[in-house]
């Protein structure tokens, strides 16, 4: 309900590093997605004078487990037990611009995607695809929502993954490493969208942006700057890629590696759940992504030594 110094300080730092103009603090990534969806719908409602607008999301995407965020998640086994979900969602194929074009109607208000698909198998957006989607959004007055909840906060060597592409969203979501363990998320808006969407009372939060999390977010960004963590990720990530490539070359049951920065996946012919469990017994925490990908998402403080140990454990 009120502004306070820790919130203001955190918001200024977030807007400065992101190039966005407004930020709304939430408690989680899923809540940030909910806020982004509401913003897009309100924008289209004010523009067109009616409700019932649609959103285009990507197949094999993951945006959260609340009803709204699950509605734009393109992974069926997450959705199926909770159907029917929010209507007005169409799904297109990631990195397939023609597929996106085919889903656009006069009711489309937003296109939402992860800049790097995590749960879907560690697929980075192709540069031509992301720029093409941006161009489609500009041509049809559709808002581009980029989900940076997993791939943001320095993981790719840029504070936000989209910054490497130079394709700016209208709305962005962030969470996870934003508070380094403190529960906080956020959605960001350009000034143009902020001026033509949510009004006071349209959206709210009881605990989002409280003084504690505001101080935590500020401390995280101070640490990024003091330790040059973006530069560190750009230095250590190629070494991790090299170590994973060596494993792929050595073992026939490993097929290929893909990803960006410290967000890597290795396609595996063996049951990945069993491989992840065996790695845990060796003291290495890895997770799965889809049915056949081992996902490596180490902290941005990851070192060359840790990358070497990762290879040794595997």
Question: What do the predicted segments below correspond to?
Answer:
Residues 1-306, 311-314:
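Conserved N-terminal phosphate-binding loop of PLP-dependent enzymes in the Aspartate aminotransferase
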